[in-house]
């Protein structure tokens, strides 16, 4: 693994040199310096949630969209949550994605985005931001409307949710395929469900920044649902009875190619139900990448700023192919190239000056 040692404040110049003659004090835990909430105010537009470096899945909260500054789905001034979407942009100047939104609920709900001036108008809940936890590869927040604590972590192609429910005969997980990021609009959606009451799958086609975007998903629950119902072709509800403090896990895998591709990705990347091990693996993936650059300073604030910025450079571009290499090309045909990984969300007009040159050093 390439190691780069950087002396502040001339970090940018010394990154280009790719090394220094002096060795800083040994450091092994770099994720502890990352504060994913840096950049969530003003015009920062950064993603908050769980992912791994360059992962296809960025699973995290999506608020009721308001203005341009909500294009990542999260703004520190807003505590609404309409669900946890599996794709997000970060740091961009335009909105899109928010594909396959999932929301744990209790009781009857209105199947819509809703408005903040009417709490019963949609699926949304306020989040208790005072108890919100976010670190590389892990996100957690209590939803005050439903009394549910939502946690999530991820592999490259799979989001893993853990919901802690109150005692209820009306607990449920709602899949929302209508929700999209700002200018994104669903054009074709649908669901399938299995006979064993533990799996559902489907697709979401949309238009927006990407004129014809196609995402397929496969989801699996840690226990059978008591009832499954669809509301049109854009919403589905899997219902459960829960005891107080019961934890329900949900895996959601994505594919740019097909439902079968999503099922293959799920089986390959997350066959087990070990939430803690998955979160630890995500943390390790981030630590491995962050440790490629070491800075010679004892200033904790400088480390927090530096490693958070480095973390943000690896939210995108994101993998956009299946584990077997299948991907959908710009010609909308399915391709497979051995040894090739397809990526998307480059947003080159934002990144070509600094982030892309950095990629040539850290990820040649």
Which ranges hold each PLM region?
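Bacterial N-terminal signal peptides that target proteins for export
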Residues: 1-8
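Repetitive helical segments and hydrophobic/amphipathic motifs
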Residues: 11-12
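C-terminal motif of bacterial Sec signal peptides marking the signal peptidase cleavage site
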Residues: 15-18
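Accessory carbohydrate-recognition regions in carbohydrate-active enzymes
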Residues: 23-364
């Amino acid at each position: 693994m390439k190691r780069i040692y950087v002396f502040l404040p001339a970090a940018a110049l010394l990154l280009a040199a790719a090394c220094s003659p002096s060795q800083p004090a040994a450091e092994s835990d770099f994720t502890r310096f990352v504060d994913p909430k840096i950049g969530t105010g003003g015009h920062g537009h950064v993603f908050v949630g769980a992912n791994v470096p360059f992962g296809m899945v960025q699973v995290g909260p999506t608020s009721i969209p308001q203005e341009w500054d909500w294009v990542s789905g999260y703004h520190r001034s807003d505590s609404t949550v309409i669900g946890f979407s599996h794709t997000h942009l970060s740091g961009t100047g335009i909105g899109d994605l928010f594909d396959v939104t999932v929301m744990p609920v209790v009781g009857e709900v209105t199947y819509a985005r809703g408005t903040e001036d009417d709490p019963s108008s949609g699926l949304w809940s306020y989040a208790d931001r005072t108890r919100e936890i976010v670190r590389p590869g892990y996100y957690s927040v209590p939803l005050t409307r439903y009394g549910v604590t939502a946690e999530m972590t991820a592999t490259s192609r799979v989001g893993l949710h853990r919901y802690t429910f109150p005692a209820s005969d009306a607990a449920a997980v709602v899949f929302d395929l209508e929700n999209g990021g700002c200018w994104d609009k669903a054009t074709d959606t649908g669901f399938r469900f299995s006979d064993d009451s533990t799996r559902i799958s489907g697709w979401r086609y949309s238009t927006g920044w990407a004129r014809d975007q196609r995402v397929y998903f496969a989801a699996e629950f840690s226990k059978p649902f008591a009832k499954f119902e669809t509301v049109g072709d854009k919403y589905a509800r899997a219902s459960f009875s829960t005891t107080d403090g019961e934890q329900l896990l949900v895996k959601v895998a994505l594919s740019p190619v097909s439902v079968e591709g999503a099922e293959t990705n799920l089986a390959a990347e997350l066959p087990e139900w070990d939430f803690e091990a998955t979160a630890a693996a995500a943390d390790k993936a981030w630590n491995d990448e962050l440790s490629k650059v070491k800075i010679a300073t004892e200033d904790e604030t400088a480390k927090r700023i530096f490693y958070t910025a480095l973390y943000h450079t690896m939210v995108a571009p994101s993998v956009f192919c299946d584990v077997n290499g299948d991907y959908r090309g710009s010609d909308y045909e399915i391709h497979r190239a051995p040894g090739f990984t397809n990526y998307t969300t480059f947003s080159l007009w934002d990144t070509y000056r600094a982030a892309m040159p950095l990629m040539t050093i850290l990820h040649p």
